[in-house]
From Swiss-Prot:
SUPFAM superfamilies linked to this entry: Thymidylate synthase/dCMP hydroxymethylase
Purpose of the protein: Catalyzes the reductive methylation of 2'-deoxyuridine-5'-monophosphate (dUMP) to 2'-deoxythymidine-5'-monophosphate (dTMP) while utilizing 5,10-methylenetetrahydrofolate (mTHF) as the methyl donor and reductant in the reaction, yielding dihydrofolate (DHF) as a by-product. This enzymatic reaction provides an intracellular de novo source of dTMP, an essential precursor for DNA biosynthesis.
Cystines in this chain: none
Organism whose genome encodes this protein: Xylella fastidiosa (strain Temecula1 / ATCC 700964)
The gene coding this protein: thyA
Main location: cytoplasm
Record's protein name: Thymidylate synthase
Active site residues according to the UniProt entry: C146 (nucleophile)
Length: 264
């Protein structure tokens, strides 16, 4: 995961100090790209321990099209708690846009189901794009999409993914985002009869919060360990049939977790 540590170091050393929506303050750079060859191990940060249950269940929650945190809380995942209302609702966030985008004529568009079928039907398409950035729905969202748009690319039997992330909390959020979209790429490759290629992560405003600087320095002092391996249940042939137990990450040997506050 040297790509991630290079980003962390660059923002720490060269980032421009800027105010932000949360009032915390950041150091940021604009425009950064990382590339991970998914055939060479699962891109999970090893220089601090990540909460795998949260990463996996959040992705499954997105794929279920849900916008209420009840599913997450049931599985002891609390990464969205700060933004939910008293009923657990977040408004039309990722799950709604991925699975039930409201068309102009009122009918709902299942972007993810369409994507699976289109990869099978027309793998050379340049339109294998999913967007969570629904301008009309932004005012109703508890938190507007940070990872806003992603595209898939098929070549030589390999499925690659590129994510555009407009806002990137590089200490807390980005390690989760890398793992989540790498996992999604593996799952999609399996159900479409492909193997994994690259995950390309393009960042807009890549920022380190002022109260994460000390933690970032600690992390940069650690030497990365070997990447783990992802094992999916090969019996699963439908993307929407994956469960938590179908996803196993082997050989993850991280350093201890580094606590840091979430900017809300």
């Amino acid at each position: 995961m040297k790509q991630y540590l290079e980003l962390l170091n660059d923002v720490l050393v060269h980032g421009i100090k800027k105010p932000d929506r949360t009032g915390t303050g950041t150091r940021s750079v604009f425009g950064w790209q990382m590339r991970f060859d998914l055939s060479q191990g699962f891109p999970l940060v090893t220089t601090k321990k990540l909460h795998l249950r949260s990463i996996i269940h959040e992705l499954l929650w997105f794929l279920r099209g849900e916008t209420n945190i009840a599913y997450l809380k049931k599985h002891q995942v609390h990464i969205w708690d700060e933004w939910a209302d008293a009923t657990g609702e977040l408004g039309p966030v990722y799950g709604k846009q991925w699975r039930r985008w409201a068309g102009a004529d009122g009918h709902e568009i299942d972007q993810i189901r369409w994507l699976v079928e289109e990869i099978k039907r027309n793998p050379d398409s340049r339109r294998l794009v999913i967007s969570a950035w629904n301008v009309a729905d932004l005012p109703q969202m508890a938190l507007v999409p940070c990872h806003a748009l992603f595209q898939f690319y098929v070549a030589n039997g390999k499925l690659s993914c590129q994510l555009y992330q407009r806002s990137a909390d590089i200490f807390l959020g980005v390690p989760f985002n890398i793992a989540s979209y790498a996992l999604l790429t593996h799952m999609l490759a399996q159900v479409t009869g492909l193997v994994v290629g690259d995950f390309v992560h393009t960042l807009g405003d890549a920022h380190l919060y002022a109260n994460h600087v000390e933690q970032a320095s600690v992390q940069l002092g650690r030497v990365p360990r070997p990447q783990p391996v992802l094992r999916l249940n090969q019996a699963v042939t439908d993307l929407f049939d994956f469960t938590y137990d179908d996803i196993v990450i082997e050989g993850y040997d991280p350093y201890p977790a580094i606590k840091a506050p979430v900017a809300v």
